């Protein structure tokens, strides 16, 4: 019965099959590169999602951001099952309440992936992990795949900016706005 399967389980089964067939190595890095590629096949193109976001935004900015946040989760860009592992608590201090977070959702590289990254051809594309070029990027051993990533273009004071949610969600609906130019 596949009706009640969670996305994590579906992807795990597909990844295990890919490993058993020798399509990918069995490491977090290679599994993440491959499942991101799979999820991209199920997503509409960026322009279609941007158009839908704008249509919703014209009616209700709140509904547009809800739509985009849910899409970021449903596309596995925000990996809910990893974010659940994060530790969060508050501490009273002389300066007020401090939020403490321990991010366990960002995958650690295994020794084989670290060695492979050292030997990998260096690339300056994308320029950084927070730029427009990441949208749809296939990734490599030393740069995460972003094929399932969709960025919403926005304008601030006449400038072009990108709006996205953080894949690691330090806080609820943690978003990032970055300049369209480096």
Residue ranges and their predicted role:
Residues 1-182:
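Active-site microenvironments that recognize anionic phosphate/pyrophosphate groups
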